[in-house]
Amino acid sequence: MNDATVIAADIQSVNGVIHAVDGVLLPSYVEYSLGTVAEVVLFDSDFTILAAALRQVDLLETVATVNDITVFAPDNAAFVAAGITSLDGFSDEDLTTVLTYHVLGARVLSTQLPEGGIAETLEGRNIYLGYLFGGRVLINGLTEIKAVDIEKSNGVIHVIDRTLVPPAGDIVDIAIALANADEGADFTVLTSLLASDEYSDIADAVRAQDNITLFAPNDAAFEAASGVIAGLTPEEIGEVLTYHASLGRNFSYDLVQGQNITMLNAQTVNVTTINGETIILQDKSADETNVIQVNIHGSNGVIHAINKVLIPNL
């Protein structure tokens, strides 16, 4: 609380007593936040969930007092878009991890965002920025920056439309988690193959890469290809599996018309795009596969779900 002097004491009323003071008393968190990044979060009604989260884990003062920071600030709608409507399910440790994943340790205006598209957060892990036509910027393939360069005394805010969540594991771990989901489980065939003794070396090779892209056939894709796969040798099935991963962290916006992607088995897949959105892959059998879900982000890469199994030259 700030200081104020009592200038008239003991003014009696029917339901209490009044002491007049010569200044407005402010809670300490209001006083130290004025003019800072924290002020925007505290006093803008669009950021009430973010403000509550920062206060819950005692990070509000940090955001107000640390100099030269950049905050990618999710508004209330951004939390809802990420499926977060309450903070009740978060431990303080998890909430701190999520919040610090939204902060860079330098003042970075929109014109200064790294050309390479990689920025390290205070949480310690990187975020990945994609620069699209018309000046649009995506983070980790799914979150868009919708307002930029709100400058305050100790840093700058960019408002985002979806809360950032640090990846829960590498892309093999994430595929396994999706296969074991309580609702909408998928990729069970793919992950069972990767977990088997026969192909665990492929899973290990994927895990070992720092930047890799996995085109993951869903269960329906494997069912549709069961006749073909049943006639393959174990070595040929291994060749099929390595034909679904490529080196490099390629988000959907990195997949462009006419591109040839070299897979881990050294064979290529051709990319076709329709209206810059629909992505179609053509394998060595000239069969076409649709990318049906994009930018599932992992610690060492990204997953795109596909609706057919890619078949290489065998």
Regions found by a protein language model. Name each.
Residues 1-314:
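Mature, structured domains of secreted/extracytosolic soluble proteins
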